[in-house]
């Protein structure tokens, strides 16, 4: 019997015994016995262990909701909120560029963004128009999207790693009327210039040699220098539910999609991070993440824009300079994502690691296997791990430092934040349905797909989707919690324990079935990486002709050709089940990652274990010999012909 059922039964028994005329003490004792016997003691245990956590989480939820309500009623937008911050502390440092040493005060950021707003208004851009921004992370990046927002123009924030077809695709799908690019991106723009429409205006910001100037490009900086720096005389008439900018998905599973970020979503993400981890006005945040993604530009820069913190930017993460920057700029909060923490652990031990003032590291993707090693080596007291995607409505946060957890949902107040793990078909990753057509919720310990109930009138539960309607529709399921409702499908598999803590398992498609067992790519990657001294590893499943399921394949960074596959295999046998050990190995100079340090597997999966597709060293696990053997075209042909036992 579940706790609510046990509670109902105990109340009923109490009423019945009282009705029969027994003393109230007997009735109470009997009711308590019924409650405990029905499993209610588990509920009491959960309450005792999680009440403090849940009440703090509830206070954060209420605080963010009240702040959003106040701003909505006032007709505020993100630029309005920033301007209030700038008026309050004009001379405080807003942004610091660690690469160049350039510092911008709040007054300077406000002035620059005003110039951007006035210039594009003068050029005829109207509220709702789109301008693509394509430059590395530096103060100008923030000033550009903020200034465009002041004019009601939507910025499409392009990934600076995009080239050729993906770059042209993202520009095309954004419906941008203009492109602002940094001088450092001129070559990339030149590669796609013929694919871009002639009506697309181009502006270049930053250093650019005369030989690099494209024929149809205007130099932005001189134009901004001549533009008025006062606020626009007429506000664009936007609100918290209007579009602020587009952020593109990482593209780990195909071409990027443009996720819509409205003003209230920007506020919500930044505010949840601020209050969940008790950030302070005096904090200095170190942000070495890409500004074209939400972690760097909303969770990080949002602390500057909304709450007035100083944010130190570094356009590209550097493991060797990370702690030096933190010491130099007196940083108290740092951000991480993906594999950053592992890269830091690979660095030689230095004294500077212990001279910093960092009290909080906030981000996502810290593997449980290195969580405690990271905190102990670098002396960071608090880890603020969270789960969320730019567009999702089911973000969660680890607010009390539970090792390995990416967040929680209350087991007591389950309806306060309507998210759920639901059972899915392991092959198709489609939600399973019960006899009434509703999704089947998972019990504690059961992995399931994370979903969030959609309510477009609630800024904490709305789903704004993507520029592409078809992409938006693919992320929505109906009749999930109850008949006729709608829910956002995260695409991620998590598992929840009895206390409501959630643990990230896999992104949909990051498991494969082999020998009748489900293999988690993330778990195998963590084991291999640890065995190899935190080396970059990508694990994925590949189809073998005539064989059911997918065989495991591991791509391992081996730039100096020093890895001995069979020495590694001896260790693998001690720590991985036989079905989880990779059948194929690919040793390559480096493993491709996205701009947010997520492993890029699309090309690797497409090329599979075919030696004709790559010049990298390939190996095959010959089970009869019990060792990895080189995989050439002859061995490949024999595998495809079924000559080997797999």
From Swiss-Prot:
**Per its UniProt entry, what is the enzyme's top EC class, as one word?**
ligase
- Where do transmembrane segments lie in this chain? 14-34
Q: Which SUPFAM superfamilies match?
A: Acetyl-CoA synthetase-like (SSF56801)
One Gene Ontology term from the biological process aspect of the record = long-chain fatty acid metabolic process
> EC number(s) per UniProt?
6.2.1.15, 6.2.1.3, 6.2.1.-
Record keywords: Cell membrane, Cytoplasm, Fatty acid metabolism, Ligase, Lipid metabolism, Lipid transport, Membrane, Mitochondrion, Mitochondrion outer membrane, Nucleotide-binding, Transmembrane, Transmembrane helix, Transport
Which stretches are Cytoplasmic in the membrane topology?
35-646
Q: Which residues lie on this side of the membrane: Extracellular?
A: 1-13
Q: Which residues bind AMP?
A: 246-257
Task: From the Swiss-Prot or TrEMBL record, state where the protein is found.
Answer: Cell membrane; Mitochondrion outer membrane; Endomembrane system; Cytoplasm
GO CC terms of this entry: basal plasma membrane; cytoplasmic vesicle; endoplasmic reticulum; endoplasmic reticulum membrane; mitochondrial outer membrane; plasma membrane
The family note in this entry says: Belongs to the ATP-dependent AMP-binding enzyme family.
Stated role: Mediates the import of long-chain fatty acids (LCFA) into the cell by facilitating their transport at the plasma membrane. Also functions as an acyl-CoA ligase catalyzing the ATP-dependent formation of fatty acyl-CoA using LCFA and very-long-chain fatty acids (VLCFA) as substrates, which prevents fatty acid efflux from cells and might drive more fatty acid uptake. May act directly as a bona fide transporter, or alternatively, in a cytoplasmic or membrane-associated multimeric protein complex to trap and draw fatty acids towards accumulation.
The name on file for this protein is Long-chain fatty acid transport protein 1
From which source organism is this entry?
Answer: Mus musculus (Mouse)
* Gene that encodes it: Slc27a1
